[in-house]
Amino acid sequence: KLEQALRAAGSNEIGGVLAAEQIGDGRFLVVDLSIQSDGTISDFKRDPIQHREFIQRFHSRMGHRPERFNYLGEWHSHPNYPAIPSEADIQQMQDLVEDVEQASTFLVLMVIKLSEDASLRGTIYGFRPQLGPVRGRLRGPENTLIKEEFEPIIVMPARRKTDDS
């Protein structure tokens, strides 16, 4: 579902929410995700009403067992940029997890893209109130690793000391 949506979106950002099953202590299996496809080449803004309805339908399908099946967090694509959260993404997630109406003890953000070889590449971060983001590990279907996206680091050569500096 995700790969097909990423292919269809091409160079436009898309996103949605992640619905998951808790399969162990701190371990979750994403069992469904919503897809909103109206982003641009450099921006995605989620529609809260669409995703709230998706989570309500998810709870109904799973028998209203929120201790096992629940909203895990958000996802969106960065087809034209590294699949890492921007500063705005991080701030938005921190604001979400600290929103008292949200009532979550933690949320995740997955940023994903299709790489040139059509494989998934991305990152996932966890957010908790009053704490900084923590990077997690993504696994794909059949427990395959999704290629990790790394932040580019620019190394600047040291300035040479001259006689007049």
Where do the language-model regions lie?
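MPN/JAMM (Mov34/JAB) isopeptidase/deubiquitinase module and associated MPN-bearing subunits/adaptors
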Residues: K1-G73, S77-S165
